Structure formats: C-alpha cells, structure tokens
Amino acid sequence: MVNMKASMFLTFAGLVLLFVVCYASESEEKEFPKGMLSSIFAVDNDFKQEERDCAGYMRECKEELCCSGYVCSSRWKWCVLPAPWRR
C-alpha cells in the first residue's frame, strides 16, 4: 500500500514538473518573436506621430479629451461612440 502511494505521488510530481518545463519553454518561444518584431519595427523619435489634442476611438480619456463625435465612457474611461443609453 505504501509503494502504491509513493508511486502515485512520484507520478503526480513528474506530471507537475513536466507541465512547468513545457510552460517555461512555451513562454520563452512567445517572447522571442515579440522581441524580434519590436527590434525590426522599432520607431525612432523622428518618426513618432505627434500627439493629438483629443483622444480617438477606444483611447484612454480623462474628463473631456475625446475628439468630436466621441464621449468619455464613465465606466471604462475610453472614448466611445455616443449612444442614447450613454447619456
């Protein structure tokens, strides 16, 4: 009975270890393309867009900084399209 408990514990510990190793290697694989793409498409300060005076659709807003045609959502703090239920 003790051997069965020990073997079940070792099997479970092995599965947990396998899961951790697979998760770690997968997360490293996900970071590699992101790092490569960010270095390829790195934006220089000369090419950055100028900041707008107002925030566009789905941009973060504070008080009344949304562009015309949009309203600041009180719940999400994003600029959204005005609708009758958002008055």
From Swiss-Prot:
Source organism superkingdom: Eukaryota
Localization per Swiss-Prot or TrEMBL: Secreted
Molecular function as annotated in GO: ion channel inhibitor activity; toxin activity
InterPro entries referenced in this protein's UniProt entry, alphabetically: Huwentoxin-1 (IPR011696), Huwentoxin_CS1 (IPR013140)
Coiled coil: none
Propeptide: 25-52
Chief localisation class: secreted
GO CC terms of this entry: extracellular region
Pfam families per the UniProt record, alphabetical: Toxin_12
Signal peptide limits: 1-24
Record keywords, A-Z: Disulfide bond, Ion channel impairing toxin, Knottin, Secreted, Signal, Toxin
SS bond partners: 54-67, 61-72, 66-79
Record bears the keyword Secreted: yes
Tissue: Expressed by the venom gland.
Record note on domains: The presence of a 'disulfide through disulfide knot' structurally defines this protein as a knottin.
Purpose: Ion channel inhibitor.
Family membership noted in the UniProt record: Belongs to the neurotoxin 10 (Hwtx-1) family. 51 (Hntx-8) subfamily. Hntx-8 sub-subfamily.
Name the UniProt record assigns to this protein: U3-theraphotoxin-Hhn1e
